[in-house]
Amino acid sequence: MKQRKGVLIILDGLGDRPIKELGGKTPLEYANTPTMDYLAKIGILGQQDPIKPGQPAGSDTAHLSIFGYDPYKSYRGRGYFEALGVGLELDEDDLAFRVNFATLENGVITDRRAGRISTEEAHELAKAIQENVDIPVDFIFKGATGHRAVLVLKGMAEGYKVGENDPHEAGKPPHPFTWEDEASKKVAEILEEFVKKAHEVLDKHPINEKRRKEGKPVANYLLIRGAGTYPNIPMKFTEQWKVKAAAVVAVALVKGVAKAIGFDVYTPKGATGEYNTDEMAKARKAVELLKDYDFVFIHFKPTDAAGHDNNPKLKAELIERADRMIKYIVDHVDLEDVVIAITGDHSTPCEVMNHSGDPVPLLIAGGGVRADYTEKFGEREAMRGGLGRIRGHDIVPIMMDLMNRTEKFGA
Amino acid sequence: MKQRKGVLIILDGLGDRPIKELGGKTPLEYANTPTMDYLAKIGILGQQDPIKPGQPAGSDTAHLSIFGYDPYKSYRGRGYFEALGVGLELDEDDLAFRVNFATLENGVITDRRAGRISTEEAHELAKAIQENVDIPVDFIFKGATGHRAVLVLKGMAEGYKVGENDPHEAGKPPHPFTWEDEASKKVAEILEEFVKKAHEVLDKHPINEKRRKEGKPVANYLLIRGAGTYPNIPMKFTEQWKVKAAAVVAVALVKGVAKAIGFDVYTPKGATGEYNTDEMAKARKAVELLKDYDFVFIHFKPTDAAGHDNNPKLKAELIERADRMIKYIVDHVDLEDVVIAITGDHSTPCEVMNHSGDPVPLLIAGGGVRADYTEKFGEREAMRGGLGRIRGHDIVPIMMDLMNRTEKFGA
């Protein structure tokens, strides 16, 4: 039995709702997508609910689900993925957080991003914190880009049900950290101590003395949120399916999810996760990786951003760019030897300007696939697709089965 | 982001099977329903299994499921809903029962409804029981309509797994109460004592002395069944979804379910839950309530009765009356600002003359809805609908998501 390779392409936030400006079509229906339409003709469509019908998914929970894990059982916060995504090496019992450098004046947060402090300044401040703050557990504090940083408390995973101190708007004092159980109460106490001591170090740091003199907002306070630890999964993707798996991703959060479950992660030059990303660089990298890997996951972010920005025409254009990315891949593989799945991690309808619980159209084409009657890729056409309405966690098993890599249960 | 309002219309027992008398159509397919057909064109259809495929649902379990609760986890008997539905104020730890006044002669139940005793006589007898029966717990005993009454044991909710003493046919002695655990064993003992003492009070009551002289069956015994307590739900509907919710209902059992989960319940003049109900009074009330409420639930009962009575043409006529009720609502709202769902709580096929486990056609139309290819509302057309085949408990999350009232899980 021939084993096929798998290509999973996630166009972030792909699904949408009918839009007047597009004549009642969705961006995917409006866009000119000859390659995806061709794949729809020779393949099979359906709708997938990333988590369950009507439930908006986050990017992290949606990817966990699409990679086959029940997010209600596996998800334990975003921080761990963010930390992996910025290149930290973590242990499974570490607890990680997203951090903002912020400005505190007279007990009130006056700027949640410390005047968008530069990456260089932030890294220097992070170093000072790492060297001078003393708390009862080992920690890693690392600057990411701009005002963003990551905090890791070693060995504190059990306390992941801890809240945040971010008031989420300027003019308010920091929140006290909340907790849901004894283990996270301990973490909350450590975080309060950490924030207090970091404030002392930051407030008198030469970089902030200089910013103060220049009239710039000082980066003298830390806002900590998004506690997260290693997802509670029975087995890493690569072990579970016995495949060599690679991901082509630019966004830290999604990189982190892919790393956490065993993918080798690549970010080709030019891939940014922003509107200006180089999708053809991703296509070339994917084709190259298909030589060595059994399963390649390609993530395309900007479709989601266009939904958040309520820009239907831009979303349609980005889908057309994604179509060209997919064409390059299709042109460089033998479709008999590959199973290609294309979907979104969730819907980000322009009218909602956020993730929604609408199902996401799904396309599977390649070797072994039973073609249905569908003619093009789109929300309405997917409703009559042969895959029916499935859950996000069904996608990978269906792919692996078409790839002839599943195992029989029973005799 | 605009938040929409929701209208959920339940045509009780709507689903049916093909009927020779209707040329092989179902009553819904046979009926002339221009408004629902219009909504099907601009909206989306599907099939919903109230509980799960092939499983007939009761009206209480079906409504619990459609309101988003798993009835296998949440349902704890019907009595509580009946008691709420007849206007009793209950605490969450109360245990309630449906009661019949019945006739006992020589140790045998000779009439399960005591000659359909009048409401006035029954209320007088109920008063005598309330005043003269002494058992080890506080109780409320209240006459409803005709031979029907309600019993509430205060604070005894834990014992809801108690059986009944109703032999369900005349000529048999009352059953002893059964039980499934220690808490319900105690309730069974209390009920045996209650029934015995009530029998003593009733048997010598002047009303029964008079009935005996007139040759009428005496109402000297109580048949107690349908033990029920507050449903085991994580949160009331109104709290869970942060909406102000109203119900337009006439039937006690469904009223009770709606009250239990936080709805304000209205029964406009003329709404009876019988064939003679005034559906236009319901429509007007619903439109009025939409000014103040975020979510309005309208229940239409007689379609179910026509199924129980195996009267296909009457069922079709009732569906046409429901269509006019829906037209009034559609004419008085802006469909861009509202999400309307129409379905049944279960199928009541004429050939079955009872609830069946057939899936129920479902229609959703209004703002944000992705239209599918369907053209009219009916069982067969629903099979190719874009909603696919979902569960009853998916309906409200899908509505709330289109109403832009859901919250993201994950980051």
From Swiss-Prot, chains A, B:
Keywords from UniProt, A to Z, are: Glycolysis, Isomerase, Magnesium
Say if the entry is tagged with keyword Methyltransferase: no
Quote the catalytic activity from the record: (2R)-2-phosphoglycerate = (2R)-3-phosphoglycerate
Query: Per the entry, which co-factors are needed?
Result: Mg(2+)
How is the activity of this protein regulated? Inhibited to approximately 20% by EDTA.
Q: Determine the domain of life of the protein's source.
A: Archaea
Q: What InterPro entries does this protein's entry cite? A: Alkaline_phosphatase_core_sf (IPR017850), ApgAM_prokaryotes (IPR023665), Metalloenzyme (IPR006124), Pglycerate_mutase_ApgM (IPR004456), Pglycerate_mutase_ApgM_sf (IPR042253)
GO process terms (BP): glycolytic process
Transmembrane annotation, as ranges: none
Q: In which pathway does it act?
A: Carbohydrate degradation; glycolysis; pyruvate from D-glyceraldehyde 3-phosphate: step 3/5
Q: How does activity depend on pH?
A: Optimum pH is 8.0.
Class of enzymatic activity (EC top level): isomerase
**E.C. number:** 5.4.2.12
Cross-referenced Pfam families, in alphabetical order? Metalloenzyme (PF01676), PhosphMutase (PF10143)
Q: PANTHER family attached here?
A: COFACTOR-INDEPENDENT PHOSPHOGLYCERATE MUTASE, METALLOENZYME DOMAIN-CONTAINING PROTEIN
Subunit-structure text: Homotetramer.
Function, please? Catalyzes the interconversion of 2-phosphoglycerate and 3-phosphoglycerate.
The family line of this record is: Belongs to the BPG-independent phosphoglycerate mutase family. A-PGAM subfamily.
This protein's name = 2,3-bisphosphoglycerate-independent phosphoglycerate mutase
Which organism is the protein's source?
Pyrococcus furiosus (strain ATCC 43587 / DSM 3638 / JCM 8422 / Vc1)
Q: Highest lineage ranks of the organism?
A: Archaea, Methanobacteriati, Methanobacteriota, Thermococci, Thermococcales
